[in-house]
Amino acid sequence: MQTNPAAPETGPEPTDTRPTSPSSGAVPPSTASAPSAASLPTPGEGLPGVPAPAAELARVAAGRAAGALAGPAAVRLGDVVPAPGQVLPDPAGDFTLSADAVLRVSPAARDVAEQLAGWLRPATGFPLPVADTTEGGPLTLTLSPADTAVPSGAVASGPASTGREAADVAGGEPSGATARTAGPDDAGLGDEGYRLDVTVGGVRITAGTPAGLFHGAQTLRQLLPAPIESPAPVAVRWAVPGGTIVDRPRFPYRGAMLDVARHFFPVEDVLRVVDHLARYKLNHLHLHLTDDQGWRIAVDSWPRLTEVGGATAVGDGPGGWYTRDDYRRIVAYAARRHVTVVPEIDLPGHTNAALVAYPELAPGKVAPPPYTGTEVGFSFVDPADERTYAFVADVVGEVAALTPGPWLHLGGDEAFKVPADSYRAFVARAQRLVAATGKTVVGWHQLAPAEHVDGRVLQWWGTNGDDPETADAVRRGARLILSPGNHAYLDMKYAPDTPIGHDWAGLIDVRRAYEWDPARHVRGVPAEAVLGVEAPLWTESVTTIAEVEFMLFPRLPAVAELGWSPRETHDWSRFRSRLAAQGPRWTTAGITFHPSPELPWPPTTPGIPTQPTPHTTPTTP
């Protein structure tokens, strides 16, 4: 159970009593909170620190969200984001969670069950004990890691499908539940798929792996009424719509990037972002750890990287960095939520902070002044000096040793002052140094001309799908993560009056974030070469976790759906309705979000306890 409603979702997290290390330079969160719905101004008034157009949007959104939750609308089986692959509703099979419910699990499923119980206990007030048994009982939630295929009957694809009659299948249901009917095909759930069955007697989540169980548990969370996000007990009927969902991801890599180099974000903020990713079945968090303005990860063999390079940020703001234990904590927290951390050490450019700390790495061997602006392309490590490669080997070696995931991101973008031949030679050596650690090289698509190393992944952030160099790299064996700047860059403004963000790649409203196909975006790149999608958030103008959330929501779930859901489920009109229904959940959970006028936000009525927003509302940079 959460004891701090504004804290990340912890559940029974492994005990860690260490205080935040003063050397981490973590910036204490602001104690100011976002305006409550009750304190919002009347039309024509403004919010402190927010320009009038943005204040009006905030007022409208808060007025809509002020209480859409007291009499929550019924949730339909397909009202889930990302859209499930196959849905077979059974209106006669609705289940109601009650105070005597028990989560019955096999031992391998206990951790997922404990997390699920932790999500549900505050709002329901139910004890929801977890029992190590798969023997069912009345009003029981059952999770099993076994991938049990059942005969396929009526198959329904897409979230708007309606059920058909099918043959009964005996056995395996919670005692007191109606027999499960054959429905969508659950063969081949893979590493992350799951099957969720809801009957009048209980809920069963079936998967082949804990990750699949976790994704199924997140789906169940969305199938409960929106007040389930409340930090205090709410007297509503905790109904779950009946039927069957069979679901698996379209792409294996689904992620978001948080730039902690331009502005530093304390560990607790990063953990909160992990929770947001996990909620929408994103499974990778890319941390942009180094840039001109700051170096954010401790490297024992090069201590001045953080002691000196970690002291600055954009706009002369306070710097900060993660100690090794800080980083381990982030990695472990993410892993428990089936999110893999992808660390980025940006090379050879974007290195001013490193050069301030170690001028021998600079081409002129003179320390540049610290940089707190937002220009790019002026800094680089000396590709002709052997000390540079000793530095790279030490840094990637230490970061790789702290990172259990398979990836290490080398950056590689915007090294404008490095001659092309020197750039290719540097990247070739740096890639081999990463490969020597056992990690798979990831880099921005500017790495494309360099020699290929086995497994190499390019992250494509262009705005024009015609990219012959990237297509050639794919022909040589590279795979792609799609992050098109004009669709997936979440630091772009929603509209001209958005109070924070950029517009160099255009404005990205929710529809633009949703309406593109990763499998067909770069010409000459076949669908099978696309590993997945990632939504980057650069933070030159983003300074608090509330501002991070404002830029993530509601666009992050749009990119998440592109990565998870089958192409045939993609439909803007249906998506916007499903996405708008998330608004009351975000309000109750204390998540700051942009009240996009594109979405039909539900009508609201007051009355549900909400979690406080973590810091402040967005302000102009």
Model-derived features: positions:
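Conserved, mostly hydrophobic/aromatic
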Residues: L103, T209, A256, L277, ...
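Acidic, contiguous N-terminal accessory segments
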Residues: Q2-P28, A37-P249, A400, V441-A448, ...
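Active-site beta-loop-alpha junctions enriched in small/polar residues
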Residues: A261, T290-G294, E344-H350, D413-A415, ...
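Hydrophobic faces of well-ordered beta-strands that scaffold small-molecule active sites
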Residues: R254-L258, L285-L287, V341-I345, L408-L410, ...
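Flexible, acidic glycine-rich loops studded with aromatic residues
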Residues: G125, E451-R456, W461-P621
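Feature activates predominantly on carbohydrate-active enzymes
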Residues: L189-G377, Y389, G397-A400, P404-W407
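Active-site neighborhood of glycoside hydrolase catalytic domains
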Residues: P359-E360, G364-V457, W461-D472, R476-G477
